[in-house]
């Protein structure tokens, strides 16, 4: 395969790997809550949806009254609030 064909294939795979974000109207309301960092316990890595950047971002949460914009993995965050 020529280098041009490989570049085209790579470009198509890149487009396929980054789906279009869903609209804000399709997201649950809790996706727009600010992250709750907590106050007690050992910090652990978590992810929350940031509507300002339209991305799921990592943070360290401690156990307390965490809100529902708080996910174990980036994939769970994206499936619920971000990219479909």
Swiss-Prot record:
The keyword Signal applies. Coiled coil: none annotated. GO terms for cellular component: extracellular space. It is found in: Secreted. Residues 31-81 form the BPTI/Kunitz inhibitor domain. Keywords: Disulfide bond, Protease inhibitor, Pyrrolidone carboxylic acid, Secreted, Serine protease inhibitor, Signal. The modification Pyrrolidone carboxylic acid is found at residue 25. Belongs to the venom Kunitz-type family. This is Kunitz-type serine protease inhibitor 2.
């Amino acid at each position: 395969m020529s280098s041009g064909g490989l570049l085209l294939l790579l470009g198509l795979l890149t487009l396929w790997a980054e789906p279009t974000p869903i609209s804000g109207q399709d997201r649950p309301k809790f996706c727009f809550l600010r992250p709750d960092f907590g106050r007690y316990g050992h910090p652990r890595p978590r992810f929350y949806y940031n509507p300002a950047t339209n991305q799921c971002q990592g943070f360290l949460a401690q156990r307390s009254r965490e809100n529902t914009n708080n996910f174990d993995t980036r994939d769970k965050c994206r499936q619920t609030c971000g990219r479909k």
